[in-house]
Regions:
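Active-site loop/oxyanion-hole signature of alpha/beta-hydrolase fold enzymes
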Residues: 1-28, 162
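Flexible "cap/lid" loop of the alpha/beta hydrolase fold
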Residues: 9, 40-45, 49-80
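Gly/Ala-rich beta-loop-alpha elbow adjacent to hydrolase catalytic centers
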Residues: 31-39
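Hydrophobic, aromatic-rich cap/lid helix
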Residues: 80-104, 122
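Short beta-strand/loop motif that positions the catalytic acidic residue
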Residues: 110-111, 117-119
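Conserved alpha/beta-hydrolase "acid-adjacent" motif
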Residues: 124-129
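Catalytic histidine neighborhood in serine/cysteine hydrolases
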Residues: 130, 134-151
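Catalytic histidine-centered segment of alpha/beta-hydrolase-like enzymes
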Residues: 148-157, 161
C-alpha cells in the first residue's frame, strides 16, 4: 500500500482513504489495532460514506509513552520479526514514530454510524481506551472477548465471528 512512499501514518491513511473512496456506495469498515485507527479516522473524515464501523483493539488517542517504548523494543528485534506486518523494520519504527501525536478526542462527535467496539479481555494496552471510545460514540456497543488478548481474531475467532455476524445482521 505504501510502495515507494514514506512509512508515515499520513501516507498510510492517504492510501487507505483512496482505496475506500473507490467504493461508490456506503461502506462498512472493520479494523484491528492500526486498522481500527485508520477506520476510525476515515469515519471521522467521511461520516456520510461509512455505514457502520467495527473497531477491534482500538485507540482514539495514541498512548505516546507506550508507542515510544514499543519503538525502542522494535530497534532490538531482528528484521525477520517484521515480515508479519508487511513492512520492513525501519518502516514499522518510522510509522509508529509518526503516530504519537494522533488524538481524535475532539472529532469523535463526527462519527454518526453504528459502531461495534471489540477488545480482548487480556488486551491491557487497549481495553480501557476501547471502553472509553464506546462511551464517546453516540451509537456504539462494546463487547469484550473472553480469554482473548490483542490478536482477538487469532485468539477467539469463533466468538469474534459470532459478534461480528450479530452486528452486521443489524446494520441496515
Amino acid at each position: 500500500m505504501l510502495e515507494g512512499k514514506a512509512a508515515t501514518y499520513g501516507e498510510l491513511y492517504t492510501a487507505f482513504s483512496e482505496e475506500c473512496d473507490k467504493e461508490n456506495d456506503e461502506i462498512v469498515l472493520c479494523g484491528l489495532s492500526l486498522g481500527a485507527v485508520l477506520a476510525l479516522n476515515y469515519a471521522i473524515d467521511h461520516p456520510n460514506k461509512v455505514k457502520a464501523l467495527v473497531l477491534i483493539a482500538a485507540q482514539y488517542k495514541m498512548p505516546e509513552k507506550l508507542l515510544k517504548f514499543q519503538n525502542m523494543l522494535f530497534r532490538f528485534m531482528p528484521n525477520t520479526m517484521f515480515k508479519q506486518f508487511g513492512f520492513k523494520k525501519a518502516d514499522v519504527i518510522s510509522l509508529c514514530g509518526t503516530m504519537t501525536e494522533l488524538d481524535f478526542r475532539d472529532s469523535l462527535c463526527k462519527v454518526s454510524c453504528p459502531a461495534l467496539i471489540v477488545c480482548g479481555e487480556k488486551d491491557n494496552a487497549n481495553k480501557k481506551a476501547s471502553k472509553e471510545l464506546a462511551s464517546y460514540l453516540s451509537d456504539s456497543h462494546f463487547h469484550e472477548l473472553l480469554k482473548a488478548g490483542h490478536e482477538a481474531n487469532i485468539e477467539s475467532p469463533e466468538e469474534l465471528a459470532t459478534v461480528l455476524q450479530e452486528f452486521y445482521d443489524n446494520v441496515e
